[in-house]
């Protein structure tokens, strides 16, 4: 079964994708890296700075899948054409983002409020776009029972793969992913199905593979940020060593400093990564508080050095 890295705004950018592959290698890399969503410009004029994230030269290694956030099917199809011209084979459509700033515009999982709009959107996409187009979705807006009508629409189109995150929009990321609701979906899907949601350990990956052997893949987001060696461990390899984590985080810090042109901006991005990674270190509670408060690069470097004097927590 294939393992995918989920698209996460502020985390799974090109700096992270390259650094993850460098430090965790073939055994620990994702089979596919889904890039954080981009929105097609309404004037159909591409902004070079925004497209730099998907420049093929900046994305060697494992396949990268661009993700689009849109509500105009024809505009999305045009953008798919632009991405095909860059050499991308598959493009993913985001019908799952639960952020209020997105859903208020009728995009992401906000589109699921009206299945007729989902139908019109996909009609616009598939009438004008060529090649594989996959979809990432939630179960609905208010309750999982909404998914039956939504899936009926998905089944009308040649979607190359359907990634299902079994929460509804209103949940955001609260509560637990609804595995029971997910289990009802694959037998009714006409396309390959990928699972996404609340996967944080190798044991959970293996349990999903055993329970749903027909899945095309499993997509992991926060779990992979919290344990960058997760896929390696699931494939029978070793947990991350302190030396690997040190090199990985140092390269991320330097990469973000170069990308943003500012070590201060890089510190802000690194603090987001440390929110998940700090729990790899035993007894880091006091340093975690310091990490949250600091702002200056020199403060960050001092605290990180202190964190790396601590022992690692034993993985499952």
State each model region's role:
Residues 3-6, 33-35, 64-68, 91-93, ...:
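Hydrophobic faces of well-ordered beta-strands that scaffold small-molecule active sites
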Residues 8-82:
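Glycine-rich, positively charged N-terminal anion/phosphate-binding segment
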Residues 22-27, 78-91, 95-105, 116-191, ...:
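Alpha/beta enzyme core
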Residues 8-10, 38-40, 69-71, 96-98, ...:
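Active-site beta-loop-alpha junctions enriched in small/polar residues
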Residues 1-2, 41-63, 97, 102-105, ...:
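N-terminal small/glycine-rich loop or linker at the start of catalytic domains
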Residues 3, 9, 15, 120, ...:
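Alpha/beta catalytic cores of nucleotide-metabolism and tRNA/nucleoside-modifying enzymes
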Residues 111-115, 175, 239-242:
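Flexible, glycine- and charge-enriched loops at secondary-structure boundaries
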Residues 106-112, 171, 235-236:
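Short glycine-enriched, charge-decorated loop/helix-capping segments at active-site entrances
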């Amino acid at each position: 079964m294939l393992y995918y890295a989920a698209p996460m705004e502020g985390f799974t950018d090109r700096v992270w994708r390259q650094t993850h592959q460098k430090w965790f290698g073939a055994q620990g890399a994702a089979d596919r890296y889904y890039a954080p969503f981009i929105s097609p410009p309404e004037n159909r004029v591409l902004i070079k700075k925004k497209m730099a994230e998907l420049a093929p030269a900046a994305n060697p290694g494992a396949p990268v899948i661009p993700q689009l956030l849109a509500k105009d099917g024809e505009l999305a199809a045009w953008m798919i054409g632009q991405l095909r011209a860059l050499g991308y084979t598959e493009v993913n459509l985001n019908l799952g983002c639960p952020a209020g700033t997105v859903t208020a515009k009728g995009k992401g999982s906000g589109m699921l409020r009206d299945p007729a709009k989902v139908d019109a959107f996909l009609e616009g996409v598939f009438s004008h776009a060529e090649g594989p187009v996959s979809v990432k979705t939630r179960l609905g807006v208010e309750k999982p029972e909404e998914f039956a009508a939504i899936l009926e629409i998905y089944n009308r189109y040649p979607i190359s793969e359907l990634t299902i995150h079994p929460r509804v929009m209103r949940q955001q990321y609260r509560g637990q992913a609804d595995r029971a609701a997910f289990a009802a979906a694959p037998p009714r899907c006409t396309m390959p199905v990928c699972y996404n949601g609340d996967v944080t350990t190798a044991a959970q990956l293996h349990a999903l593979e055993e329970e749903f052997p027909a899945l095309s893949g499993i997509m992991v987001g926060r779990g992979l940020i919290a344990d960058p060696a997760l896929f390696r461990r699931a494939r029978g390899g070793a947990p991350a060593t302190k030396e690997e984590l040190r090199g990985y985080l140092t390269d991320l810090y330097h990469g973000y400093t170069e990308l943003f042109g500012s070590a201060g901006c890089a510190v802000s991005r690194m603090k987001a990564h440390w929110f998940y990674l700090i729990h790899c270190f035993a007894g880091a509670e006091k340093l975690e508080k310091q990490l949250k408060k600091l702002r200056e690069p020199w403060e960050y470097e001092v605290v990180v050095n202190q964190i790396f004097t601590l022992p690692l927590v034993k993985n499952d």
